[in-house]
Amino acid sequence: MHRFANPMMILALLSAVAGTALADEGLCKLEPAFPNLKIERPIAVVIPPDGSKRMFLAQQRGKVVILPKDENSADAATFLDLSDRKMEANESSKFEEGLDGMAFHPKFAENGKFYIFYTQQDPKRAVISEMQVSKSDANKADTSTERVLLEVRLPWWWHHSGNIA
């Protein structure tokens, strides 16, 4: 693993320098997306394979919202809200705990299934769950359909994993 560290470090530095150079020369410009939305600790934007072109924004504190089609809108529909679950060790936590990933089933358009990866406390553990969309509202998750697929005890609060695909 060590022999890959130097080439990877060089690649990362070159990428950072190239991106900075492009911005300095005016070849690219970063602009805020959805400037009127209140977004807290975003971790993923996921587009379901259902042809709807909806963009789901997963946030670390346990909420998943559907981004509005109008980028200037201040409203985003809440798809899933797990913020009442004890995902983080404390409210002011700025670590990796919380909702860490989301993925849609390849046949989401047919079965409405999606998957989330999150942490839980007491005992501290990583969880991968399957859920389904509400039968009455395609813009809402049905948390009563949650099926825990995997739970792994975590001895520490850092570096549990990342996104799921």
Regions found by a protein language model. Give the residues of each.
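Bacterial N-terminal signal peptides
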Residues: P7-G19
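Acidic, Gly/Ser/Thr-rich repeat motifs that build Ca2+-stabilized beta-propeller blades
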Residues: L22-A165
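Positively charged n-region of N-terminal signal peptides that target proteins for export
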Residues: M1-N6
